[in-house]
Amino acid sequence: MSFNHQQIEKKWQQYWADNKTFKTENETEKPKFFALDMFPYPSGAGLHVGHPEGYTATDILSRFKRMQGYNVLHPMGWDAFGLPAEQYALDTGNDPAEFTAKNIATFKRQIQELGFSYDWDREINTTDPAYYKWTQWIFIQLYKKGLAYVDEVAVNWCPALGTVLANEEVIDGKSERGGHPVERRPMKQWMLKITAYADRLIDDLEEVDWPESIKDMQRNWIGRSEGAEVTFGIDGTDENFTVFTTRPDTLFGATYCVLAPEHKLVEQITTVEQRQAVEDYLEKVKMKSDLERTDLAKEKTGVFTGAYAVNPINGKKVPIWIADYVLVSYGTGAIMAVPAHDERDYEFASAFSLDIVPVLEGGDISKEAFTGDGQHINSDFLNGLNKVEGIAKAIEWLEEKGVGEKKISYRLRDWLFSRQRYWGEPIPMIHWEDGTITPVPEEELPLMLPKTDNIRPSGTGESPLANIAEWVNVVDPATGKKGRRETNTMPQWAGSSWYFLRYIDPTNTEAIADPELLKRWLPVDIYIGGAEHAVLHLLYARFWHKVLYDLGVVHTKEPFQKLFNQGMILGEGNEKMSKSKGNVVNPDEIIESHGSDTLRLYEMFMGPLEASVAWSTNGLDGARRFLDRIWRLLVNEEDGTISAKIQVSDDKTLEKSYHQTVKKVTEDYEGIRFNTAISQMMVFINDCYKAEVIPTAYAEGFVKMLAPIAPHIAEELWNLLGHEGTLSYEQWPTYDESKLVDDEVEVAVQVAGKVRAKIVVAKDASKEDIEKVALADEKVQEYMAGKDLVKVIVIPGKLVNIVVK
């Protein structure tokens, strides 16, 4: 017999909605638990089966914690600004707001059909002016703190599309859409000074319970390195440039320098003979994105400027080259090259026949660079020193001579915050005709995104907002001064950098949220989402949170106490699901055919939550069979009432199995090991089928344990067991340690050195009693027939050894 999932699921979803079962009150007597999902971008495609995996995990924890007596905050919202909606609007002429609203409605319907216990009264949407008012407010605070500034930055400009592209949108020097040529062009952009927080962003990772791999990715992205900044003079001029190096002890091996093609000195120092070659090279570089330029596998290219630098440590002249693998935005935009001990420098020097001088002992530089450590050679006063001594001595010498100093450098760059797009938060700044910039007065926020039916790119590199003259042009009422609004919009990362705070108090018009409520709910207790957000989103959110901490808005240094990354659900052939491969599984169809409880159970049973696993229709059918098995065990086939097997009883048959199950499921839910919790529930159900009687208390306890994973069928069974309303706030079952231990033990019996039988005796049986039972055993008597008993050795609880002759 099977249960009618469609009827049961609709019934309980309606009940939860009508009764606002999961509405979170701000009560203070209960401990709090804030379970957060990475909110989705509502695309046109709707949910696929990968989305519910993380959402089911947070839902299990939320339902589990409610039953443990926690006040649970479990919200959902929409990260709804972004390129796809704008692209759709460009292609169809429709308003991106309409497209977005339609997509949100689809996502919300699908999410509700999966039975997640969200408090929908806290739903947020980053495109809602009441929400982005506070995104703009945060930007103004960043500006006031000197953390938002305008800078001229090289961007990927696509003349054909009339817009700037992100690095990810450029492939081999052409736009991903349409394959148009892309060039590098300097443009004024808003930047956020995330580098000012670099050390704190590294150090505070110690305070959070995150996967070590994600912490390492963030540390590497920030890329803190200690070394020295060294000044190289340019031969025959008063000019100089600085390089950062982690190995100032290898300066004696620096045989050439490389400047980024965009370095401000290039034009000045290039000789007449080399000018044409340098200009040709600069043209080529314009077509490449930073990602292509720094690809380690690509062929090394570069050109000699004709100029020489003076190595400060030995006075030798070294040639100055330009090469695309040096970026002006990274470090000082110049490097010293020590080809004997660096693979990239070695390849470059070999390609262009430049000198290679070893300064560390070991290796064979005629074959390859030696990147190991050895004593210093060919290094004058550093000879014979090891790495640590050499670095210290070199820095001391550089500082003494005034040509260098100890320095910490970071790989992290400031965050380029401008987007030349329409569908994003307007940046609330005004550029005045006298060259000053001021924020929009805070009382005038939100600065609304104007409605327009022309969101074509402006063609000037500005966003489509530049086309809306009546919005762009402003006059200061006090002075009559003319100004222009900032026409760039914020990136999609903006709204997601603080959204978790708004769930705490989503309708507050006076502040991001009530300070007392922020104190009550922060930090987020568990944040579950994909590892693809390991760096950018998580780093940006941590940065904004630290700024808000410094402003006194929040009281925690870190926003997310525990982070968990679910794995990916792959197609049946172990490939990533994608529309182009035609292997996307739509949850709507599964909910229709198998039910959302089955989908939730299956996705949690596929394997460890953090593993990537292939979708299997057989596995899905197996999950449904398990739920059918539970239903058949507990419900009469004929009349749909509760089975006669379930009785108020103190029958001990299932006692150990039940207490083991409560212990295992409780610990596995806490540890986010849902697959093994389900395995244990399967063991218990098997035991129940073998038992004559199932005590009512055990049936009720089991239904409570099933509820976080399969909430609809659990609610229905709870009602059939004679209860009214929802089990969402019922007390979580408890176990008794003493019931996990058997009263009886199995003891092996050896006759003449071989195990001949196994006997079961009371755990506390005396040696005499154990001996009696052993000697009375039929098999033992068989092997003793015709032999004399010499002695019996009893090791209680383990072994009886019968010696015969």
From Swiss-Prot:
A motif ('KMSKS' region) lies at residues 576-580. ATP binds at residue 579. NCBIfam families: leuS_bact. SUPFAM superfamilies: Anticodon-binding domain of a subclass of class I aminoacyl-tRNA synthetases, Nucleotidylyl transferase, ValRS/IleRS/LeuRS editing domain. Pfam families: Anticodon_1, tRNA-synt_1, tRNA-synt_1_2, tRNA-synt_1g. InterPro entries: aa-tRNA-synth_I_CS, aa-tRNA-synth_Ia, Leu-tRNA-ligase, Leu_tRNA-synth_edit, M/V/L/I-tRNA-synth_anticd-bd, Methionyl/Leucyl_tRNA_Synth, Rossmann-like_a/b/a_fold, tRNAsynth_Ia_anticodon-bd. GO terms for cellular component: cytosol. Belongs to the class-I aminoacyl-tRNA synthetase family. Its EC number is 6.1.1.4. The keyword Aminoacyl-tRNA synthetase applies. It is an enzyme of class 6 (ligase). GO terms for biological process: leucyl-tRNA aminoacylation. It comes from Lysinibacillus sphaericus (strain C3-41). The keyword Flavoprotein does not apply. It is found in: Cytoplasm. A motif ('HIGH' region) lies at residues 40-51. One of its GO terms (molecular function) is aminoacyl-tRNA deacylase activity. The gene is leuS. It catalyses: tRNA(Leu) + L-leucine + ATP = L-leucyl-tRNA(Leu) + AMP + diphosphate. Keywords: Aminoacyl-tRNA synthetase, ATP-binding, Cytoplasm, Ligase, Nucleotide-binding, Protein biosynthesis. This is Leucine--tRNA ligase.
